[in-house]
């Protein structure tokens, strides 16, 4: 089910404050956040946001085609390394 259009998109308050502060100063710094559920809004374009994936922060440069998506979509949390070569347990 999609998010209602009547409601505003969710953006964490502390993240929004940091972005507004950098926009006023016209500075470009890496913003560190744990808020994977925040929606990307147009004022974030051009900033680099380091998103936590459970282990480390991955820096993501925000571009205009990312608007409307969640931050967590761009920082994968799982690493699939493939199945073992000689694993025949499932064939029994």
Swiss-Prot record:
Residues forming coiled coils: none
PANTHER family for this protein: RIBOSOMAL PROTEIN S19P FAMILY MEMBER, SMALL RIBOSOMAL SUBUNIT PROTEIN US19M
Domain of life: Eukaryota
Keywords associated with the record: Plastid, Ribonucleoprotein, Ribosomal protein, RNA-binding, rRNA-binding
Places the protein is found: Plastid
Protein's recorded name: Small ribosomal subunit protein uS19c
Family: Belongs to the universal ribosomal protein uS19 family.
One cellular component term from this protein's GO annotations in UniProt: plastid
Job of this protein: Protein S19 forms a complex with S13 that binds strongly to the 16S ribosomal RNA.
Gene Ontology BP terms: ribosomal small subunit assembly; translation
Source species: Cuscuta obtusiflora
Pfam family, one: Ribosomal_S19
Classification via HAMAP family: Ribosomal_uS19
GO molecular function, one term: rRNA binding
């Amino acid at each position: 089910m999609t998010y209602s259009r009547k409601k505003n998109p969710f953006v964490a308050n502390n993240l929004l404050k940091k972005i507004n502060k950098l926009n006023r100063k016209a500075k470009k710094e890496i913003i560190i956040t744990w808020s994977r559920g925040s929606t990307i809004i147009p004022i974030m374009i051009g900033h680099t946001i380091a998103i936590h994936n459970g282990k480390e922060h991955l820096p993501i440069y925000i571009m205009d085609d990312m608007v409307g998506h969640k931050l967590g979509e761009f920082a994968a949390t799982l690493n699939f390394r493939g199945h073992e070569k000689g694993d025949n347990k499932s064939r029994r």
